[in-house]
């Protein structure tokens, strides 16, 4: 079991903890598939709703909040039945807008894993307005059921009435619908190719600034992040922040980053290079490789 879970595992009922420990191996990064979840429910003799709420301390253990020191965990349950944990991330010494909220982390985890719809969001603190707006960008966002400890469950539409969303800006295919944009680039570099693929899957209906970041660690492992825009603009999730959240969930340190690549479209209304460099330089003393590509 990873050291970061030692404290949180003691907060779980013993039958659930005993069943969960084998899953918390060195490669565990917050994903539990539908079959594993069913086995946890059976072994613990708890309901699924009780298990998901009980797992929140495990999700919160993925957090990295050096500024607030407030650990928030979130669990997104997909239509597939799989669950995806996420946690808040803050960049030391940097402006607060670089922060990743736990709900954003969990949703990006699900998106990068190929999930097509979120049906439940379990979180240990009431979602802030920023996160409510971010969730509203998703497929059937208003119908996502929000679960909080010691509170009744409600749909997102209860927490965000009279919502402003993608349809107000004539966007009919929201976040989590598979979007593919093709770009022209001749490269044999696997890391650049990976970034190009993820840029093509990014979500930028308001600026067409399709973009992705890939980080490589000293052992050659890679961690990606895609741009995810929002109808309200400010809650958009930048690809570097998503990549750093991804890396953190995998229990890697920022000091292990040895290479960073940003690929973005030449036809976008904005460029993400400045914000991407700011975030990177807050955590790693390396230069950003910036590649601009033309849509096919």
From Swiss-Prot:
Sites where the protein binds Zn(2+): 101, 128, 131
Active site, per annotation: 103
Record's keyword terms, sorted: Hydrolase, Metal-binding, Zinc
Reactions catalysed: cytidine + H2O + H(+) = uridine + NH4(+); 2'-deoxycytidine + H2O + H(+) = 2'-deoxyuridine + NH4(+)
SUPFAM superfamilies: Cytidine deaminase-like
Gene Ontology MF term list: cytidine deaminase activity; identical protein binding; zinc ion binding
Binding of substrate, residues: 88-90
Cofactor needs: Zn(2+)
Enzyme nomenclature, EC number: 3.5.4.5
Domain of life: Bacteria
InterPro entries the UniProt entry points to: APOBEC/CMP_deaminase_Zn-bd, CMP_dCMP_dom, Cyd/dCyd_deaminase_Zn-bd, Cyt/Deoxycyt_deaminase, Cytidine_deaminase-like, Cytidine_deaminase_bacteria
Protein family per UniProt: Belongs to the cytidine and deoxycytidylate deaminase family.
Function: This enzyme scavenges exogenous and endogenous cytidine and 2'-deoxycytidine for UMP synthesis.
Subunit annotation: Homodimer.
This protein's name: Cytidine deaminase
